């Protein structure tokens, strides 16, 4: 009986050893994250950005649809008429990223594609105040990610 049990343990050992050797020489599936980055889907929703027209004018018309549709109530907008033509523009556009659930409703509701969720997922901060985005920060994000945002918005795949 002892001989049988020892043979069973030895068999299990070799099965385990074979598995270890198999995965040791198999192609690696993990990436070294900070140095290597994997592909990002065109549907990915990350850090928010406010876009501008090509002439530099802000796209946001302060319709407040994004504020109304936000289920987390993370968006706050204040509007005022412009002196030049009387159209409304956002004087204050704040997003509390600690409340945001990245649902994309704000992007879908916007009639002029002013607010979008960009490709950036590396925006971790050390304190909470840095996650309260104001209009300037959102416009800077839009300028920084404009080429990637255009690519994401003009994708042919519209199925959900």
Swiss-Prot record:
Cofactor section: [4Fe-4S] cluster
Gene Ontology CC: one annotated term: plasma membrane
Known partners and oligomeric status: NDH-1 is composed of 14 different subunits. Subunits NuoA, H, J, K, L, M, N constitute the membrane sector of the complex.
Protein name, entry field: NADH-quinone oxidoreductase subunit I
UniProt GO MF annotations: 4 iron, 4 sulfur cluster binding; iron ion binding; NADH:ubiquinone reductase (non-electrogenic) activity; quinone binding
Pfam families recorded: Fer4_7
Transmembrane residue ranges: none
Gene3D superfamilies assigned: 3.30.70.3270
Residue ranges occupied by any 4Fe-4S ferredoxin-type domain in the UniProt entry: 51-80, 91-120
E.C. designation(s): 7.1.1.-
Protein family per UniProt: Belongs to the complex I 23 kDa subunit family.
ATP-binding listed as a keyword: no
Co-factor binding comment: Binds 2 [4Fe-4S] clusters per subunit.
Keywords (A to Z) from UniProt: 4Fe-4S, Cell inner membrane, Cell membrane, Iron, Iron-sulfur, Membrane, Metal-binding, NAD, Quinone, Repeat, Translocase, Ubiquinone
PANTHER family, alphabetized: NADH DEHYDROGENASE [UBIQUINONE] IRON-SULFUR PROTEIN 8, MITOCHONDRIAL (PTHR10849:SF20), NADH DEHYDROGENASE UBIQUINONE IRON-SULFUR PROTEIN 8, MITOCHONDRIAL (PTHR10849)
BP GO annotations: aerobic respiration
Subcellular location: Cell inner membrane
InterPro entries: 4Fe4S_Fe-S-bd, 4Fe4S_Fe_S_CS, NADH_quinone_OxRdtase_chainI
Membrane topology term: Peripheral membrane protein
Function (record text): NDH-1 shuttles electrons from NADH, via FMN and iron-sulfur (Fe-S) centers, to quinones in the respiratory chain. The immediate electron acceptor for the enzyme in this species is believed to be ubiquinone. Couples the redox reaction to proton translocation (for every two electrons transferred, four hydrogen ions are translocated across the cytoplasmic membrane), and thus conserves the redox energy in a proton gradient.
């Amino acid at each position: 009986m002892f001989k049988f049990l020892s043979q069973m343990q030895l068999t299990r050992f070799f099965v385990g050893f074979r598995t270890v050797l198999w995965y040791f020489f198999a192609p690696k599936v993990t990436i070294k994250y900070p140095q290597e980055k994997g592909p990002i889907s065109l549907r990915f929703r990350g850090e928010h950005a406010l876009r501008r027209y090509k002439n530099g004018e802000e796209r946001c018309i302060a319709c407040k649809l994004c504020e109304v549709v936000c289920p987390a109530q993370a968006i706050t907008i204040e509007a005022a008429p412009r002196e030049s033509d009387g159209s409304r523009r956002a004087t204050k556009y704040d997003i509390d990223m600690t409340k945001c659930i990245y649902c994309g409703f704000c992007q879908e509701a916007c009639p002029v594609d002013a607010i979008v969720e960009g490709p950036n997922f590396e925006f971790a901060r050390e304190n909470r105040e840095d996650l309260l985005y104001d209009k300037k920060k959102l416009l800077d994000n839009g300028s920084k990610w404009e080429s990637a945002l255009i690519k994401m918005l003009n994708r042919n795949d519209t199925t959900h």
